[in-house]
């Protein structure tokens, strides 16, 4: 066999492996769609203490952090919730001056001399755990809601968190994340690539409600403070600390400890291709670092997930090349046969031109065209049951992008409306700060 045949075999092996994944994806989408977003948003005043933790290198330099802080304040005012605190875990001294004046807001400075086995973000997370321990906030009375730099909270987010805590369904929970922020400024390729991530949260519902999870988001994560204090974030040099944290929670507290709160968190996609690939690189390398810390069956699931994730990209590039090469080679033959036999029916022309474009997807078509070319005869093409079966993963793939894109665009409109309110709030708080400073000066 030549190189092209080997490439076909590799691609077909990958394509067939996507069929069970597509069926599982469809099943989870159908099963979880009703609980994906929390719809019971009644305001019942049994307010627990929630600490909204934003872990960042610098809230002053990374301007989107300020947007997230004011989104919390705005949502809390609208639902009349005051039993909360915003904790900015940072390495930048300037953040104290900028945010400490805000009500219910503290700046936790990560000591440069702080020594622990954890690295990067997990080091800051562990420092925050120990800081809460010193302040007596490491009890079941407190809940921690983790956010990223660009995270944005809505009224629905807060009400969903309060409901989950009120109903006592677990000690940790996650919710859906959508990516409408700065969506219009992102590179079109990265914006499209991020469209599949909201759809992936349907799988996260099953991961959290039927643990153990083989992955967990580090943002939109609600966890009881005493549980986080016990587990900690001291996992060594891993780049995917959230994945290990989720498994350790399950290992320590069991299946019923994890749940789904259904509160939507808005975030922004990587704005350029480099950031997009660096993000994916961190996920893959982090999972590879963690894989030996999971039981055998979970190692297999993680390995399959990583392989299919990586091979999906490789297969897509290889498939595109094969489509173009095969189409360019087969199209002249198909047209010549149609011209020689004086075929004028446009449907037949369309049929054979399309079949020239899809031989790598439908091997039976490719064989028919080759035979047709040698016999110089035309007859109906039967694409076969295997080809129809292979269409299913493609349909699910397209559907996942369309649903994710719909969610991103839907919440882009919501964010545009809320950001106007947040700007008004920002200006009002700025005026109060100026008045306060003026009184002190006098």
Question: Can you name each region flagged by the protein language model?
Answer:
Residues 247-265:
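Catalytic donor-sugar/metal-binding loop of nucleotide-sugar-dependent glycosyltransferases
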Residues 1-70:
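N-proximal low-complexity "stem/linker" segments adjacent to membrane-targeting elements
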Residues 68-83:
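Short, acidic, metal-binding catalytic loop of nucleotide-sugar glycosyltransferases
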Residues 147-164:
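Acidic donor-binding/catalytic loop of UDP-sugar-dependent glycosyltransferases
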Residues 118-132, 160-239, 277-292:
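Long helical/loop segments within the catalytic core of UDP-sugar-dependent glycosyltransferases
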Residues 239-245:
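Acidic donor-binding loop at a coil-to-helix junction in glycosyltransferase catalytic cores
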């Amino acid at each position: 066999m030549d190189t092209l045949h080997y490439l076909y075999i590799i691609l077909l092996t990958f394509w067939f492996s996507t069929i069970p994944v597509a069926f599982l994806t469809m099943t989870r989408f159908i099963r979880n769609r009703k609980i994906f977003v929390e719809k019971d948003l009644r305001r019942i005043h049994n307010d627990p203490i929630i600490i909204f933790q934003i872990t960042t290198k610098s809230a002053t330099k990374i301007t989107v952090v300020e947007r997230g802080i004011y989104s919390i304040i705005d949502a809390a005012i609208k639902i009349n919730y005051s039993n909360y605190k915003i904790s900015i875990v940072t390495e930048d001294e300037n953040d104290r001056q900028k945010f400490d004046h805000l009500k219910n807001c503290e700046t936790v400075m990560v000591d440069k001399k702080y020594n622990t086995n954890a690295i990067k973000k997990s080091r800051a997370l562990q420092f925050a755990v120990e800081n809460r321990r010193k302040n007596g906030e490491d009890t079941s009375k407190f809940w921690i809601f983790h956010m990223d730099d660009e995270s944005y909270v809505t009224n629905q987010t807060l009400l969903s968190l309060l409901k989950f805590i009120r109903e006592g369904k677990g000690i940790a929970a996650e919710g859906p994340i959508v990516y409408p922020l700065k969506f219009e400024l992102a590179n079109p390729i990265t914006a499209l690539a991020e469209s599949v991530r909201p759809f992936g949260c349907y799988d996260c519902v099953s991961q959290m409600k039927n643990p153990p999870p083989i992955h967990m988001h580090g943002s939109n994560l609600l966890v009881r403070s005493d549980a986080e204090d016990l587990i900690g974030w001291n996992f060594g040099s891993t780049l995917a600390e959230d994945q290990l944290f989720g498994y350790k929670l399950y290992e320590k507290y069991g299946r019923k400890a994890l749940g789904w709160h259904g509160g939507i968190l808005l975030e922004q996609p990587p704005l350029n291709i480099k950031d997009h690939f660096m993000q994916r690189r961190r996920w893959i390398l982090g999972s590879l670092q963690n894989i030996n810390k999971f039981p055998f069956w979970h190692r297999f699931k993680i390995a399959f997930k990583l392989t299919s994730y990586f091979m999906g990209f490789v297969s897509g590039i290889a498939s595109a090349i094969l489509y173009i090469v095969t189409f360019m080679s087969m199209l002249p033959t198909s047209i010549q046969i149609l011209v020689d036999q004086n075929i004028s029916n446009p449907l037949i022309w369309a049929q054979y031109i399309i079949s020239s474009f899809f031989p790598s997807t439908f091997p039976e078509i490719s064989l028919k065209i080759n035979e047709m070319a040698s016999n110089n005869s035309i007859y109906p093409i039967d694409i076969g049951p295997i080809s129809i079966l292979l269409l299913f993963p493609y349909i699910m793939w397209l559907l996942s992008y369309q649903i994710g894109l719909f969610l991103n665009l839907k919440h882009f409109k919501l964010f545009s409306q809320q950001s106007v309110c947040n700007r008004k709030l920002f200006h009002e708080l700025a005026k109060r700060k100026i008045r306060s400073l003026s009184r002190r000066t006098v």
